[in-house]
Amino acid sequence: MRAWMNTGTTLALLASVALGACAQSNVARLPSRTGPTDKLDMTTWSVVGVDPVSGDVGVAMASCVANTLADALAALVPGKGAAATQAAFDVGNRDKVYAALKEGRSAEEIIRLVSDSVTDARLGSRQYGVVTMSGGRVQTAGFTGKPMLDGAAAPNASRWAGVRANASRGVSVQGNTLVNEAVVANALAAYVWEDPTGFNSLSDRLIRALEAGSVAGGDVRCNSDSVRQTAATAMIVVARGTDGPYATEKIGLSDQGTPKAPWLAISTTTSRGGDNPLLDLRRKYDLWRRTVKKN
């Protein structure tokens, strides 16, 4: 594993020291897309990235909610863009974003589409991060509900929320209920960092960005009541430029390991107070990467 830090200390070592050894946990099966998904809290921080040269697109996420709908937040349309729909998740809004990506709409257009309080009574509980590409131009746009922003800005606030992006590098990082702003700031820095050893593929950048957010503290709910876990669920999905679009039809990590899954689809879930899932996600990712390289 290669880290983004110039000190030479790897993220794997930092995570191991801070969070303890990792153990595999069974992946939870969750409600289908017909269930009351808009009442479920989804995703504390996520990273959306695109490669305008190859057309590859991907999303990585982590949350303290163990029974999260991790895979459902992602909308991937190779060659056009990717998005994360999170906080108070609504599959209908995810589908709107997905359809707009397939239509080739810009990131700003997509955010306008889903940030209208007239059509969404729960807009204040939503968060989005979108990255689009067209004709070599990359655009980023994000949205965080005002109540989340107001709460993060309050005196002595302990639940930071917001979006940070870098359009020139094709990345957007968004999060809510975070320990502090460093979770997204460090994730963004990790994503754009150039590993001198060459571990700079889209998937490499996504996973090291997610790890950097974990090292910064992650989800405040997993860092309270003597628990120092940062997350309970972690996931990464990537589709290549030549692949078809992807947004899961049956949420609950059910596509993992099936023909429906995108080129890269890895997830892991642990119980609250258990081992940090980012460690197991890295182990699975490194194994996947070695297998892909051999092939």
PLM features: what roles do these ranges have?
Residues 1-5:
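N-terminal secretory signal peptides that target proteins for export/translocation
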Residues 8-20:
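Bacterial N-terminal signal peptides
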Residues 26-295:
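N-terminal nucleophile
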